[in-house]
Amino acid sequence: MTDAASTPARAAATTGAGTILHDDDAYTDSLIDFVTASPSSYHAATEVARRLDAAGFTRADETVSWEGGLPRRGYVIRDGAIAAWALPEALPAGAGMRIVGAHTDSPALKLKPSAAVVRSGWQLINAEVYGGPLLASFLDRELGLAGRLT
């Protein structure tokens, strides 16, 4: 029987400082820290930006011309979305690209437009299911509010 920690197929990820993690516990801790810091898509975009900054990426401003070119390693944020890229030193003509995508706004319980209601003397917050949550996972924890007021 082999010890999972001694096998070559171990987890590898990066910390906020861009350090490669080859330790399962450090990988797990980094993921837990990310999830804790990201109760909404807005928080997740901010946390990803913080980690990208620590790894040497540059935030690009969408409101100005990029005539001088994009930063080689950069990102843009709009609302609760973030797009990041890493360009090679030299890009051969006809070279392809790889795009990886994910979204952080689902599953969730989202407030309805008329969220505050009173029923039988109880002040309630009217919410709707967004995405496909495993509802049982919401039953054994305190719920909170996170996001942006508009």
Question: Can you say where each PLM-predicted feature lies in the sequence?
Answer:
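N-terminal hydrophobic/helix-forming segments and targeting peptides
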Residues: M1-T150
